[in-house]
């Protein structure tokens, strides 16, 4: 064994061994308990970042630990390979998205191997290959036949210059992010999957997810947004149709003083024919991108349509306004306004001088003061005719019943959740498998024409999708009739909604899933990824699992038993102000810093001498140039050091502050482990451990070893507090470093301790542990070694600490054998100088003894 720890030599050797032996490849084995450990698959952007490294290290630690428990562990990896960034990169680099993507996959695969992750590479998949997306296309056609897929026209952000649809986040200050053209709202036909048909089940089954973070479950509950209320129909004078609104507060209905409709509502459109002001307002709304988050804060605007609706209970005429806070996509495109008891309605009514009618009493029973704001709390009704005096619940039911009896109301359960729009007008995605025949019939692509393959050898102009630009691509024949293929592609959330199931049978050619393999491995035992995926990906992931269950492919209700959301990785951020006042961000690697005595940064500059402004720790990002390249760190310190720091610096679900001093500390620790094993093995073979022959000191050290095994097992397995597990191993290492190594049993005990330490560290730092296990002559490869088991007998304390009091005051603390008698404890106490001093020349009148804890001598 060489004396120095050289990670660059051992890591590549160990990785080659894993590759050649196919160590982490697994198959179904009914005789073993399975464990499916999965990290969210990466987008092949070109290089791994520290967020990836943290996510995958957590997964690898859990997978390796479960494997050492003797389980059949599946840990696969793949590539979420479709998506918009590839199109931008292709245009920029004058290539096509496919070669750019495949090059990135090859590069990042090497980076993953360099970090020593124990993946089953035989199951690797890339979602941009026809072998993968063909089954997604087939499944979509089956959902269409079941009535779960439909096409409808819906409003999108449209860039007239690029001739493309933009996501909300691609619209900046009302303009296209790419060409700065003013964005328009445009109605275009799109494909939807009916996730709303599963809304109740998606909501109710959250209660089954005992091992998912409450924050994620709450976010999903709010996103699904189930509410109970009443749908109310209004007659509108001089208008051919009724107006329908939905409310969760029918108790306030007598205070409804106006209605508001979306700018795109047919009533507003009709009114605009003779109202130029309204027509201009509708035009303004059409070109305003409205994301839900922005609606709460934006200025509320409106125009009176001139139409009057009739309040069904009071018979009063109330105005109908077009307002920018009502969206056609939500509900009926019309809302009832109760300005006395809803703050948004109050602000709008105050702005435009509309009637504000209070109908709920304040908590003290007085009429509410509405001079400053609405009263939004629930309470007792007044000013409401026959409903006066009713509380919220009674009024809700009484008004709902009355409206229902009159035929103008209906109790309804509503959801905030909308059906999933899966159409994208982009090129780099899976083609949607639908065709339109010459006679206008729309139908799924026949099975014998699947997969609909996306051509990869294309020229990108950065504006139009190549399959939209090429009229020949869309032409096909169905049932002997000319037809046109759909040129939209799937939302990339489609691919990431079922990949976890395809990992169980990546080579299966008879269908989407091999049910036998899928049901052996599923559900996933632990799924690891960022909390930013709480509502989109993790909701679609659950939805797809239920769709596959209802298609008979899987037999479980939920895709993953446990969800672990790792925290973000933060790093120092620095900038200097340029000549034009702009901020130039400088990488923390290039910052030369001065710190105060507490280690805080007080001054910084870069190599060029610029004075740097330190903005604190923030999430690693390109925009702040504060990302740390994992590859550089691995080359500098080794993969094991990077992995150990990642797991030690912070609890897995909390933010991690990147500190190179911490990385250096992790590296020093591994050098100490190496040194101790080197010194131990240099002394030659070791005798067998004779537990009965150990001295008290040796027993105490062995007790520490086995207590550490018990703690680390609990920390990794049950608590998943990996940082405290590492801290416990470090503490034990400090004791081992000071332990005597001369006697035969000293060395035998050290052998037992080091074999345990190396196995406990193995999930975190597998390369060094693989090597040290061999040097310690452990049996076989450490990858097949069992997890160490704590010896209960060794952990039993044979001595205990007893507090000695004289007349209730503590005079000494003594160590006695656990089974010592009261007499023996008294005798031992009497040997203590301070106790003897207070007993001198006095009589012990009473003895209070709590075995193993307390001895109180009452003297007088």
From Swiss-Prot:
Q: What keywords appear on the UniProt entry?
A: Aminoacyl-tRNA synthetase, ATP-binding, Cytoplasm, Ligase, Nucleotide-binding, Protein biosynthesis
Q: Where is this motif: 'HIGH' region?
A: 42-52
State the signal peptide span: none
Q: Where does ATP bind?
A: 622
Q: Keyword Nucleotide-binding, does the record have it?
A: yes
GO cellular component terms attached to this protein's record: cytosol
Protein's UniProt keywords contain Secreted:
no
Gene Ontology molecular function terms on file: aminoacyl-tRNA deacylase activity; ATP binding; leucine-tRNA ligase activity
Tell me a GO biological process for this protein: leucyl-tRNA aminoacylation
Query: What EC number(s) has UniProt assigned to this enzyme?
Result: 6.1.1.4
Task: Please write the reaction equations for the catalytic activity of this protein.
Answer: tRNA(Leu) + L-leucine + ATP = L-leucyl-tRNA(Leu) + AMP + diphosphate
Q: Name one Pfam family in it.
A: tRNA-synt_1g
Question: Where is this chain's protein located in or outside the cell?
Answer: Cytoplasm
SUPFAM superfamilies, per database record: Anticodon-binding domain of a subclass of class I aminoacyl-tRNA synthetases, Nucleotidylyl transferase, ValRS/IleRS/LeuRS editing domain
From the record, which residues define motif 'KMSKS' region? 619-623
HAMAP family xrefs: Leu_tRNA_synth_B
**Family, per entry:** Belongs to the class-I aminoacyl-tRNA synthetase family.
> What is the protein name stated in its UniProt record?
Leucine--tRNA ligase
Give the species this sequence originates from.
Shigella sonnei (strain Ss046)
């Amino acid at each position: 064994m060489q004396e120095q720890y050289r990670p660059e030599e051992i890591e590549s050797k160990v990785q080659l061994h894993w590759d050649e032996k196919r160590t982490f490849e697994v198959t179904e084995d009914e005789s073993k308990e399975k464990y499916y450990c999965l990290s969210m698959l990466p987008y092949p952007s070109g290089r791994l970042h520290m967020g990836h490294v943290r996510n995958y290290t957590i997964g690898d630690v859990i997978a390796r630990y479960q494997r050492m428990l003797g389980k059949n562990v599946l840990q696969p990896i793949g590539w979420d390979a479709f998506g918009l960034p590839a199109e931008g990169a292709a245009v920029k680099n004058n290539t096509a998205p496919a070669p750019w993507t495949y090059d990135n996959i090859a590069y990042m695969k090497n980076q993953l191997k360099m970090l020593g992750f124990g993946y089953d590479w035989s199951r690797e998949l890339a979602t941009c290959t026809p072998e993968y997306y063909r089954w997604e296309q087939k499944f979509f056609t089956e959902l269409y036949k079941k009535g779960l897929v439909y096409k409808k026209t819906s409003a999108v952000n449209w860039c007239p210059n690029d001739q493309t649809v933009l996501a909300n986040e691609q619209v900046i200050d009302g303009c296209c992010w790419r060409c700065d053209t003013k964005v328009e709202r445009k109605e275009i036909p799109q494909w939807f999957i009916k996730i709303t048909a599963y809304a109740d089940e998606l909501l109710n089954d959250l209660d089954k997810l005992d091992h998912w973070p409450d924050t994620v479950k709450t976010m999903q509950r709010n996103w699904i947004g189930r509410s109970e209320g009443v749908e109310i129909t209004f007659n509108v004078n001089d208008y051919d149709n009724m107006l329908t609104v939905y409310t969760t507060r029918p108790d306030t209905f007598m205070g409804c003083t106006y209605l508001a409709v979306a700018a795109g509502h047919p009533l507003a459109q009709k009114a605009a024919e003779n109202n130029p002001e309204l027509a201009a307002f509708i035009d303004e709304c059409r070109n305003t991108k409205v994301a839900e988050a922005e609606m709460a804060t934006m200025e509320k605007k409106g125009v009176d349509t001139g139409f009057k609706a009739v309040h069904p209970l009071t018979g009063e005429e109330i105005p109908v306004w077009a307002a920018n806070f009502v969206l056609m996509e939500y509900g009926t495109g019309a809302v009832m306004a109760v300005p006395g008891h809803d703050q948004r309605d109050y602000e709008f009514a105050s702005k435009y001088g509309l009637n504000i009618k209070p109908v709920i009493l304040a908590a003290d029973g007085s009429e509410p003061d509405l001079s400053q704001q609405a009263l939004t709390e629930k309470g007792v009704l007044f000013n409401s005719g026959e409903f006066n005096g009713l509380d919220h619940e009674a009024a809700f039911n009484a008004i709902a019943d009355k409206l229902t009896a009159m035929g103008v109301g209906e109790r309804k359960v509503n959801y905030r959740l909308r059906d999933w729009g899966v159409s994208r007008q982009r090129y780099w995605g899976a083609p949607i498998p639908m065709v339109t025949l010459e006679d206008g019939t729309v139908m799924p692509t026949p099975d014998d024409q699947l997969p609909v393959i996306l051509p990869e050898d294309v020229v990108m102009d950065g504006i139009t999708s190549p399959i939209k630009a090429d009229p020949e691509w869309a032409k096909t024949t169905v049932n002997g009739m000319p037809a046109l293929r759909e040129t939209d592609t799937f939302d990339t959330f489609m691919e990431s909604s079922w990949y976890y199931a395809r990992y169980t049978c990546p080579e299966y050619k008879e269908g989407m899933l091999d049910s036998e393999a899928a049901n052996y491995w599923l559900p996933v035992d632990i799924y690891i990824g960022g909390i930013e995926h709480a509502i989109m990906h993790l909701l679609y992931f659950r939805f797809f699992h239920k769709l596959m269950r209802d298609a008979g492919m899987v037999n479980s209700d939920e895709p993953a038993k446990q969800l672990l959301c790792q925290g973000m990785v933060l790093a120092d951020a620095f900038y200097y102000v340029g000549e034009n006042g702009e901020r130039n961000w400088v990488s923390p690697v290039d910052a030369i810093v001065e710190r105060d005595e507490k280690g805080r940064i007080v001054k910084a500059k870069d190599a060029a001498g610029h004075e740097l402004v330190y903005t604190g720790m923030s999430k690693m990002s390109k925009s702040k140039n504060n990302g740390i390249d994992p590859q550089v760190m691995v080359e500098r310190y080794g993969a094991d050091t990077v992995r150990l720091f990642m797991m030690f610096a912070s609890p897995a679900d909390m933010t991690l502050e990147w500190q190179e001093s911490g990385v250096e500390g992790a590296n020093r620790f591994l050098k100490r482990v190496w040194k101790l094993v080197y010194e131990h093995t240099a002394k030659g073979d070791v005798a067998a451990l004779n537990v009965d022959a150990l001295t008290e000191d040796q027993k105490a050290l062995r007790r520490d070893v086995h207590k550490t095994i018990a703690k680390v097992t609990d920390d990794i397995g049950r608590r998943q507090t990996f940082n405290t597990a590492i801290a416990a191993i470090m503490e034990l290492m400090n004791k081992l470093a000071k332990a005597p190594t001369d006697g035969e049993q000293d060395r035998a005990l050290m052998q037992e301790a080091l074999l345990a330490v190396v196995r406990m560290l193995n999930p975190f730092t597998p390369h060094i542990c693989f090597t040290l296990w061999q040097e310690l002559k452990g049996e076989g490869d450490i990858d097949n070694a069992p997890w160490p088991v704590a010896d209960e007998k060794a952990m039993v304390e044979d001595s205990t600490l007893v507090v000695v009091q004289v007349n209730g005051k503590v005079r000494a603390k003594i160590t006695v054998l656990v089974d010592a008698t009261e007499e023996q404890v008294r005798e031992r106490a009497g040997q203590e100088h301070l106790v003897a001093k207070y007993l001198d020349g006095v009589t012990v009148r009473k003895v209070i003894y709590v075995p193993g804890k307390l001895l109180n001598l009452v003297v007088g």
